[in-house]
Amino acid sequence: MKKIVMTAAILAFGVINYAQADTIRATSAFGPKHVMAQAGYPALFKKLKELTDGRWTGYDTPSGLVGPNEMNSALREGITDMGPVMFPYFSADYVESGIVGDLSMLGTDNRAIASAVSEYIATCPECIKEFSKNGQVYLGSDATTAYQLLSTKRIESLSDLKGLRVRTGGATYSYIIEKMGALPVYFPASEIFEALSSGVADATYSSIPDLKNIQLYDAVKYVTLIDKGVFNAAAMTNLSQRVWDKMSLEDRSSMARAAQYAQTIAIYSWRDTAAEAEKIAKEKGIEFIQPDKEFVKRGNNIRDEYMAGVTEALTKKGVTNAAAKVDSYKALLKKWEGLVANVTTSDELAELRYKEIWSKVDMKTYGSH
């Protein structure tokens, strides 16, 4: 009898604990096949549950609830609790944070780039204020591998590119594309497949893993290897301030730590998926093209021209102390290039990012109104 009573008590205690667990409603937003839906967010919530002893958990609705171009207001208004905020979609709201996108031509290692972005924004008071104004708390960034031209038309020379409509993910890429003679067009990543298939766009300025991540195999016929820039202007696991305010300081720290696991999985996925996507693409008949020397030279000259004028451009956009901030980001990128040199796994990178960035953040004041 005592054994039965004890068992019932244990079960009841477990039910009560489960009922009291707070649940985060996330929207990874890029569809069920995207790495954040398949691995990133699940890893985050598994780690969060572990670190908080079950006090917090969560689930992801990868599509259908909120699109990437709606995420800013969705987080602010409580439609969802967590999701990715793409700075170029809301450039007026993220003038200071968006500086990282303007500097996306710097660096080649996406592990170092993403970590430099994360540390820059997390330690930038003006940046954190931007998120707070929109009812959000910033918890880090990832970054893609190098960008190429994924197209429906063959692009080998500048004359091939001239006049084509190329989807870009922000002002930096639009500048490069326009200077090279094409017409930049702008719409969410979730609409790329339809735009290429219908002829609204002739190409997208994206990384090779996007062939898999957003299933472009049946829309793209050519990949021109230009290796210019990455996409680093996104906060992939932004949390609603409503949720953050409910968390204890210990749980806030756990949340920041768990979020790194989602982002570093994405970082390594970009690296791992590049080779896989290229292999599948070639099997499907997609042609990979090395552009001619004139194309390469023009691209390099435009990149250098862009970087020479970036401080002035940022100042005109409203970034305060732009020169000092550019120098700060460059220093962080150099620091992280050294730190990641011997990192071999996503978990190792997640813990390194937590140690170097989030363990040093004052969780009492971070993200506060």
Briefly describe each language-model feature range.
Residues 1-4:
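Positively charged n-region of N-terminal signal peptides that target proteins for export
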Residues 15-21:
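Sec/Tat signal peptide C-region and signal peptidase I cleavage site
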Residues 22-112, 138-369:
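N-terminal secretory/targeting leader peptides
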Residues 107-133:
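Short, solvent-exposed loop/beta-turn-alpha elements that line the ligand-binding surface or hinge
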